Amino acid sequence: MLMGRLFVKRLCLGMFAFLLLASFTTAQSTQKPLTIETAFAEGGITGRTPESIQWSPDSTTMSFIQRDDAGQRGELWTFNPATAEKKVLVGDAKLTQLSPPLSRLKDDRERERITRYHVEPYIWSPDSRHLLFNSLGQLWLYTIANGTAVQFSSSPHSAGDPKFSPNGKRLAYLRDHDLYVRPVGDGDEQQLTQKGSEDLLNGEVDWVYAEELSVRSNYFWSPDGRDIAFLRMDESKIPAYPIVNWMPTHPTVDFEKYPKAGDLNPVVRLGVVSASGGKTRWISPAQDADIYIPRFGWVRDGLLWFQVLNRAQDKLDLYFADTRTGQSRKMLTETAANAWVYVNDDFRVLKSGDRFLWPSWRDGATQLYLYSFNKATPLASDAHLERQLTQGDFEVLGVKGLDDSAGLVYFSCNKDDPRQRQLYSVKLDGSGLQRISREEGSHDATFSDDGKHYYDTFSALMTPPRLSACDSAGSCNNIWESRNVEPYGLTPPKFLEFKANDGTTLYGQLLLPPASAASGKIPLIVNIYGGPAAQLVQNTWIENWSGSSGLFHQILSREGFAIFTVDNRGTPARNRKFQTAVRHQFGAIELQDQLAALDQLFAQYPQLDRTRVAIWGWSNGASMTIYAMTHSDLFKAGAAVSPVTNWRNYDSIYTERNNGLPTDKTSTSYTDLDLPKVADKLHGSLLLLHGTSDDNVHFQNSIQMVEALVEAGKQFHFMVYPNKTHSIAGATDQTHLFHLIEDHFLRELK
């Protein structure tokens, strides 16, 4: 009897094990394969996210463009938060005419400009009854009521940055480096500025202001529509960098105005011109021509505000100016000793017309402050600090909306965790700090003009993007969701914490290979950025941003690699002390933090193989990759995509903000990160990759590195992407690039 029971028990256990194995085998067989081809295909594994998401001026409607994976076909949708109605406003056939796919642009640099700087393909009219489309430089006016579109201008020359007057009766735009205006109905256009050229930009944004100061427009209508304020940029003294198209039989050259560290900058001047034409009235805030005017706008009719940033970027002045008399007054000055003053879009004048918001990290972290001024005689006295609205050891990451009627400011911050982005509100009296967003992860909100609704793009580490329309209390309706990624069986990385040598907390993450892919000691790949422009360790979905592809790392982990990332001191979204730790001394501290974190990682995870470690990065991460391989013998291999190899090669605003002028004797960055000079110190196998049309980090950087490595007798691998820009965008090129990096690590570490 006992034997019989034992037999039955063993039989049941055997059947259970068989069924479990069969279930596991079935799950494996139904799991979708994740390959470099699928990860970097157009649309990726999640689908193409909605584009050009906007609120109508009357705050009743949210609009967006949804395209197919290839980006060739699409529709413009609207959503009404009051009724929860979602519908197609402009169908595929009409949208193809009004907003053609970017693939029709043959110039990679222009495509990158549009995507990188979020150039909108359409804008709403002030009465919310029309849309103005920019179809490859040709303007079309679309009437919502009847679904018809008429071409606004038939000029063979492209028009850019179009804007309706506040009453919607006129339209301003840029053409051939000058500012024009014309009636929306019948009537002729009028040229408002003169002598525009590639050396003289009237109302147009140049490359360095767009890239490093996030300037998206350089002209603005007055509230009454009578005047336009604009910035003139004189670039005649700026050196031009040649970008060569090598593909024709006879190569062509395009010259880009690009001020490098220590070079002359654009000379800027703020002007006001009547929308009816006439002489420009110039506003002259400072005697020093070597300044930046990074932001300006209208306080009210006849009263301008503008900011003046010194070249060292450690002093920012706010001015008010009477456009009728030309008189101006400095309202406040923001200084940052041994640091820099951040320029952003958080200056907001309240509807009361006598108060404004002002961001500052004067107390050690970026917080919001409320100032007031004399509404009747604004130039009679300085601005007065009313109160600090937020405080704490967290970063306010952007004002997202204002509800003046409720006395509320909505803003993004990382109060809960430096790796998250949450939406908060605070009252204008400084009380009632409250979190609005609910889910853990990263929320990017944009409010309607009345401050009553917002759209939220949300994602988390293992949750791909989702678009929602929400009320100000945080109750949301889903508008769009990514495709389900569960069939790909992605492995969640582990969030980790480390200590720098000075005790500072560093945040990192580790992705270990699945048990089926691991055998013996595990080789480790370090992904690095390490600079002021990017935080890699976040609770957000990173599918295929070039510098840190989460899906590429998932693929590597299935090949038996562990992937590690840590944000060293000098990366953003932490307090002032953390961000400025590397000021004037790029390289050494970043590498110290990386190596300190790696020592702690190896102690915590003894299965990692210290003798098989690689490193890779893009842009600043590529610079740090080469720096690490020339200043440490830990790394057996590395891949550097589009690196700065000498900071004298990079643009003036970014470089000098962090490193001072090349003549500054207190800065070591120009000597310590002159990577060609230490080419003979290279350890490990280097793969270097760059696009020849990179207008951001010039191809010149890699050419100089190649020459130095050859002179030093160092063997290395070099891949050139013809006519590709900094992002080396496109499914074909990205697939090729990431296969190269994959093969490099398989060859060197396996």
Segment roles from a protein language model:
Residues 9-10, 182, 232, 269, ...:
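Basic side chains
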Residues 6-7, 257, 566, 731:
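Short alpha-helical segments used as structural interaction elements across diverse proteins
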Residues 1-2, 78, 530:
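Disordered, low-complexity tails and leader-like regions
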Residues 9, 18-20, 26, 563, ...:
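Generic detector of N-terminal low-structure segments
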Residues 239-240, 295-297, 307-309, 442-750:
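Serine-hydrolase catalytic core recognition
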Residues 13-18, 23-453, 459-463, 469-472, ...:
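Beta-propeller folds
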Residues 2-15:
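Bacterial N-terminal signal peptides that target proteins for export
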